[in-house]
């Protein structure tokens, strides 16, 4: 889609890191709250995007991500949404797959990683071993994962 102006993240400091500025050759000075400095020629390659995302991984955390994402209701839950607990430490689990039956009942698969963006892991459901790596929130207010619990009110979307 090439909607580069929609790719932006807020650092924990509050600074808005815009990918559209990055591809114009601006880089981010993280001193204070942050500022843009023209340091490179305009470019939009995979290497540029990866460099931008490395900066995002370094200076964004669960506190800023929780504020940036919008609340999502369980009935509208979709792949790419996340349960997020902002803090230090905080944590995020990402919905990476989902299935829905004729009654509208959903099961979903979760993935997690740790900082700084380490290898991704698929989570086993500790509450219902029969579901394996699948989760269901039917009749529940709390999502229980192997290491973290999340309220259903902590579901967020971009």
Residue ranges of predicted features:
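Low-complexity, Gly/Ser/Thr/Pro-rich intrinsically disordered linker/tail segments
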Residues: 107-158
């Amino acid at each position: 889609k090439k909607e580069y102006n929609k790719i932006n993240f807020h650092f924990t400091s509050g600074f808005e890191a815009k990918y559209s500025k990055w591809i114009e050759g601006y880089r981010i000075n993280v001193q204070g709250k942050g500022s843009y400095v023209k340091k490179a020629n305009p470019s939009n390659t995979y290497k540029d995007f990866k460099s931008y995302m490395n900066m995002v991984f370094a200076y964004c955390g669960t506190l800023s991500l929780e504020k940036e994402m919008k609340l999502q209701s369980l009935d509208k839950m979709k792949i790419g949404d996340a349960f997020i607990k902002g803090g230090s430490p905080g944590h995020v689990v990402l919905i990476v797959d989902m299935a829905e039956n004729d009654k509208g009942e959903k099961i979903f698969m979760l993935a997690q990683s740790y900082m700084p963006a380490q290898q991704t892991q698929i989570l086993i459901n500790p509450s219902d071993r029969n579901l394996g790596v699948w989760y269901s929130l039917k009749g529940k207010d709390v999502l229980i994962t192997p290491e973290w619990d999340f309220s259903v009110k902590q579901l967020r979307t971009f």
